[in-house]
Amino acid sequence: MNFETIIGLEVHVELNTNSKIFSPSSAHFGEDPNASTNVIDWSFPGVLPVMNKGVIDAGIKAALALNMSIHQHMHFDRKNYFYPDNPKAYQISQFDEPIGYNGWIDITLEDGSTKKIRIERAHLEEDAGKNTHGTDGYSYVDLNRQGVPLIEIVSEADMRSPEEAYAYLTALKEIIQYTGISDVKMEEGSMRVDANISLRPYGQEAFGTKTELKNLNSFSNVRKGLEFEVERQAKILRSGGVIRQETRRYDEASKGTILMRVKEGAADYRYFPEPDLPLFEIDDAWIEDMRAELPRFPADRRASYINALGLSAYDAGQLTATKALSDFFEQAVALGGDPKQVSNWLQGEMAQFLNAEGKTIDQIALTPENLVEMIAIITDGTISSKIAKKVFVHLAKHGGSARAYVEKAGLVQISDPAVLIPIIHQVFADNEAAVADFKSGKRNADKAFTGFLMKATKGQANPQIAQQLLAQELQKLLD
């Protein structure tokens, strides 16, 4: 029997506010254990939460970016459970009235087609702390993360393969990153994914029993974990077994999933309205203010790059990988840069430089103005493409005018025949054996002179003019 795969994803995104959702403690990553905490985070008796307005701002932006309706009469709820990293013994979250609901995004599949994935809800909540189990036999609790604001984005079970889940996460990460509400760095825990997966016979409408997967710390592991679960569940069902509703974690060492616990339901958490926070009214003006702060999103930019600028779908996809890169490209084109040439430099030398330096595009000195000027002096013959690579590295590290640097460093391309011909004659004089080979009929010997000339001019000879003059002067040797 063959089965259809049913996948839904729950994505937790940490919001990049300066302070936590209900306390003034820092929400920044990387502090010493328990350095970013106060009495609210430790749940001392009598302390009360105070709402961070910036969190609601971010929630509205996320809902709008994901094509969601917004609950304009919004409240918070208590989700009750006990765990050492949760000192209150409950989490402040949203249950029946999340900030966003009924949304969707389009994903691009491997064959280039698109598919709409519905999003059930997006709700705001506080993050829990972190438990660390030491080699000394003790467990340690770090509450720096306790109270860091989260938005949990819950998709409908619309994905039918691990590949579709991967494409959904890629598109979702792009959109959230463009809004500026999170850096969505999985390596720092600011984007975390839980996956729900079940199988059903083809033609059956009812969903099968789902399994929740955790410990999916990369998009690649999401795909691998789901692929393993498809095989595991199919094997059980084909043998006449029954799938239990349970939570499993992906184990990188074994490339499989391991049982954690029997899955709880909503009733186990005993949700009820949070009594220490008021009802929040989100009026139309607030929503429109947040809408005005949103950028053009990747899909719109890609379409523009393809249809208006004539770029390939591949180039458009690469250029919209991050908002910073896309903004840089658009600014360079607006300044008169040729779209294809700008694209080539950003995907080539820029990508290599950023990778080698471990930096992002907004951390280097090169500006769109610098790049456009550099491309212009390549086009007008002031420098060669080879020299331009050296110029690019200098500009990326130090900024400034490309033309001024080229002139100061003596990198201007030599195009004047009156300058090049004497150098060619000197090359002949310095390489008598090669000249003799050429005169004796070893015609391939002429190729060596190109290298000799470029070495003599330190790579500054104009390649086209140099080739013409070399051919001219070599012919004279035979006359």
UniProtKB/Swiss-Prot annotation:
The keyword Magnesium does not apply. Keywords: ATP-binding, Ligase, Nucleotide-binding, Protein biosynthesis. SUPFAM superfamilies: GatB/YqeY motif, Glutamine synthetase/guanido kinase. It comes from the Bacteria. GO terms for molecular function: asparaginyl-tRNA synthase (glutamine-hydrolyzing) activity; ATP binding; glutaminyl-tRNA synthase (glutamine-hydrolyzing) activity. Heterotrimer of A, B and C subunits. Belongs to the GatB/GatE family. GatB subfamily. This is Aspartyl/glutamyl-tRNA(Asn/Gln) amidotransferase subunit B.
